[in-house]
């Protein structure tokens, strides 16, 4: 090791090299406001029986102190009462038997792969692959392993059952031909002015093929047969589409307005990519390595969501620039992770007194450094351009979850959302979300309601991301320990092909994979039966079935490989050496997915660059769906302002009605002179007028959303 390498190694363990290491971002007043909101009594509705009965009537205190289930959860009937607990114990006993059988099956598959498939030269190449610390060296080792296993022949063959190779061949040929014709016109001019330019035909072709998973080119199976890359035809298609998009962007034969509309269509059809970081207590520190691998290869998506421990990592990423992240994601970061610094006697006394192991105010102080103080979701987006999303679950089991971001809660303070997303019952009590007012002070958000761990219901909020940001391609970094135990891809995963029969077989043979799938599906079935029959108890007032039954994977799922000691340190701060290992493992788990992500973002970034260059402002441009959502919100706010003015000044309404009457008479006279009488048009205009009038009393912007979607 040279002197420069030794110096670099010392630097990554030196906490003084971290940006803002000694800086405390949060203000003491912010913590005092947060403490005040936590200690505030729960708001209770005031209801009087009638005009002469007092509101706060003194009633006799109930003798019952033990909490009971609410009325709507109580099941009537003799059979339910008699059979509930015997059936519950029987199912749990059967699940225990299935769990033991599943453990034996996984042990058999592990031994089969270790002693039957991984031997000799291939085992040596695989060990070299796992020792690489950067993507370039890893890619060379992966290509060497593919060459030894004979995977290059699979890349050269176009036919494959999981995508339409005939369609892709035709599209590539047409794109090449049209692109060359457009390039000739750009150099030599158009031969005939009456014919449409070739670049317009190229736009029509791109609008037809630039779609999410067009003809199956984004099927993960296309990247699961080799350690590096995919089919040569698929790679050729990706490169050709990118070249054509660049040509349209540079063309002078299309106006900027037409280009902007063109890229809006492509963005809507192609969608966006999001990085989803799961929860998992201190297992979430594996996310740091995943982030570092994506950052070093320029494939870190702009949309990031995190839950529980993943929310802390996502907040760090969304509030820092790329240069700051490269300095922060090193082993020295462990010196700033102090959430579990208290001793055994301290947290035991707190748990006995409050029901929570950790102190909420101390966690708020520690968490604020990762969020740059009381930064809001909007401020983070304006600083870095990244869209942060945090899943929060209300303490009330019947209320819906929220996905906090700069659209749904722009002024919400990030560290309060991170604490709420990490508030596991028994670990941290439910917390109040805080919002930043115009004067910079903090106040309770959402009427002071309390929130808790988002992993309990929505660890990976795929539906909400699609609703708000048109996300249809998700990169999930999954580190939940109770899910990792059951992770198994019988046919391999992206960049991790099956070792059996040169990647064409099943892990552990077909019989081993079949038994594994059957046992896992049977356990899942019985858990669903218990949930739908409402037989599961609710410890700490929470339905815990969703921590097993929700979807935990995405289009690409990254599973960092944990070790047994991680379970022992599940609620303890990492040392620099332990964090260095987690960074290495996280990067290693992300390397096989880099090429797939590069191909996806290659087209997506080209589309977003086209939107940015062709927009009138020329600045940062959000997706058209996001801009439309902002416009709708601004219009709704303006409509409510007009309504308040009308209520305050009645004479304004009468003047407006008179003016609108004269305008309608004038429009009707001009309409009768220019076009024939159309009863259908008049009927529709009458319904439109009724709808506008009803909106004054029923101001619901979603009332006619479906009708507008059909008519547009």
From Swiss-Prot:
The active site is at 308 (nucleophile), 453 (proton acceptor). It comes from the Eukaryota. Residues 1-13, 632-646, 652-664, 677-688 have a biased composition (Basic and acidic residues). PROSITE patterns: PNPLA. GO terms for biological process: cellular detoxification; lipid catabolic process; triglyceride mobilization. Its EC number is 3.1.1.-. Residues 275-466 form the PNPLA domain. Residues 667-676 have a biased composition (Polar residues). Pfam families: DUF3336, Patatin. Residues 1-20, 628-688 are annotated as: Disordered. It is a single-pass membrane protein. A motif (GXSXG) lies at residues 306-310. GO terms for molecular function: triacylglycerol lipase activity. Keywords: Hydrolase, Lipid degradation, Lipid metabolism, Membrane, Transmembrane, Transmembrane helix. GO terms for cellular component: lipid droplet; membrane. The chain crosses the membrane at residues 85-105. Probable lipid hydrolase. PANTHER family: NEUROPATHY TARGET ESTERASE/SWISS CHEESE D.MELANOGASTER (PTHR14226), TRIACYLGLYCEROL LIPASE PTL2 (PTHR14226:SF66). Belongs to the PLPL family. This is Patatin-like phospholipase domain-containing protein AFUA_1G04970. It comes from Aspergillus fumigatus (strain ATCC MYA-4609 / CBS 101355 / FGSC A1100 / Af293) (Neosartorya fumigata).
């Amino acid at each position: 090791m040279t002197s420069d390498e030794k110096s670099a190694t010392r630097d990554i363990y030196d906490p003084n090299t971290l940006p803002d290491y000694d800086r405390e971002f949060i203000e003491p007043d912010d913590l005092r406001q947060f403490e005040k909101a936590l200690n505030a009594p729960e708001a209770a509705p005031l209801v009087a029986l009638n005009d002469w009965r007092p509101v706060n009537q003194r009633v006799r205190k109930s003798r019952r102190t033990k909490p009971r289930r609410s009325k709507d959860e109580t099941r009537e009937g003799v059979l339910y009462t008699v059979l509930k607990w015997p059936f519950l114990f029987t199912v749990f006993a059967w699940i225990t038997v299935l769990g033991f059988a599943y453990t034996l099956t996984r042990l058999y598959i592990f031994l089969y792969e270790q002693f039957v498939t991984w031997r000799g030269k291939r085992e040596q190449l695989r060990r070299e692959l796992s020792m690489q610390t950067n993507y370039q060296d890893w890619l060379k080792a992966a290509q060497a392993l593919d060459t030894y296993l004979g995977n290059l022949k699979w890349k050269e063959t176009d036919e494959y059952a999981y995508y339409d190779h005939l369609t892709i061949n035709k599209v590539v040929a047409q794109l090449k031909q049209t692109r060359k014709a457009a390039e000739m016109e750009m150099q030599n001019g158009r031969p005939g002015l009456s014919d449409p330019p070739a670049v317009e035909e190229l736009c029509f072709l791109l609008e037809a093929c630039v779609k999410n998973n067009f003809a199956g080119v984004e099927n993960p199976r296309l990247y699961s047969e080799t350690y590096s890359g995919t089919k040569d035809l698929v790679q050729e298609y990706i490169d050709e589409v990118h070249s054509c998009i660049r040509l349209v962007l540079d063309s002078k034969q299309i106006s900027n307005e037409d280009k902007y509309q063109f890229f809006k269509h492509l963005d809507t059809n192609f969608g966006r990519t999001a990085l989803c970081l799961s929860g998992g207590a201190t297992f979430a520190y594996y996310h740091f390595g995943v982030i570092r691998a994506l950052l070093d290869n320029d494939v870190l998506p702009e949309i990031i969501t995190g839950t529980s421990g993943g929310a802390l990592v996502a907040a760090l990423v969304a509030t820092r620039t790329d240069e700051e992240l490269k300095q922060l994601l090193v082993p020295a970061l462990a010196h700033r992770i102090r959430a579990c610094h208290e001793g055994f006697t301290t947290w035991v006394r707190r748990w006995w007194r409050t029901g929570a192991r950790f102190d909420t105010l101390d966690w708020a102080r520690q968490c604020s450094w990762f969020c740059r103080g009381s930064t809001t979701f909007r401020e983070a987006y304006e600083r870095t351009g990244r869209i942060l999303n945090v899943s929060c679950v209300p303490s009330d089991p019947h209320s819906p979850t929220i996905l906090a971001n700069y659209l749904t809660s722009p002024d919400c303070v990030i560290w309060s959302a991170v604490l709420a997303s990490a508030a596991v019952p028994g670990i941290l009590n439910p917390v109040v979300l805080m919002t930043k007012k115009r004067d910079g002070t903090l106040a309770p958000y959402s009427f002071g309601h309390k929130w808790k761990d988002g992993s309990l219901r929505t660890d990976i909020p795929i539906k909400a991301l699609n609703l708000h940001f048109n996300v249809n391609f998700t990169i999930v970094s999954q580190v939940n320990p109770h899910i990792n135990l059951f992770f198994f891809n019988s046919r391999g995963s992206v960049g991790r092909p099956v070792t059996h029969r040169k990647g064409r077989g099943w892990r552990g043979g077909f019989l081993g994979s079949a038994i594994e799938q059957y046992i896992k599906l049977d356990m899942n079935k019985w858990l669903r039966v218990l949930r739908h029959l409402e037989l599961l108890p609710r410890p700490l007032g929470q339905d815990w079935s969703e921590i097993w039954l929700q979807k935990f994977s995405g289009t690409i799922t990254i599973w960092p490989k944990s070790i047994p000691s991680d379970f022992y340190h599940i609620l303890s701060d990492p040392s620099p050496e332990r964090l260095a290992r987690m960074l290495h493992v996280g990067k290693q788990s992300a390397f096989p997915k880099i090429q797939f992500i590069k191909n996806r973002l290659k087209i997506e970034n080209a589309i977003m660059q086209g939107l940015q260059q062709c927009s009138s402002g020329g600045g940062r441009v959000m997706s058209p769906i996001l801009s439309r959502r902002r416009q709708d919100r601004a219009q709704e706010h303006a409509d409510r302002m007009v309504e308040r003015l009308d209520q305050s000044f009645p004479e304004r309404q009468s003047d407006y009605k008179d003016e609108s009457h004269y305008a309608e008479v004038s429009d009707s006279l001009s309409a009768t002179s220019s076009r024939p009488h159309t009863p259908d048009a008049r009927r529709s205009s009458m319904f439109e007028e009724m709808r506008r009038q009803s909106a004054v009393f029923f101001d619901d912007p979603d009332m006619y959303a479906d009708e507008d979607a059909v008519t547009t």
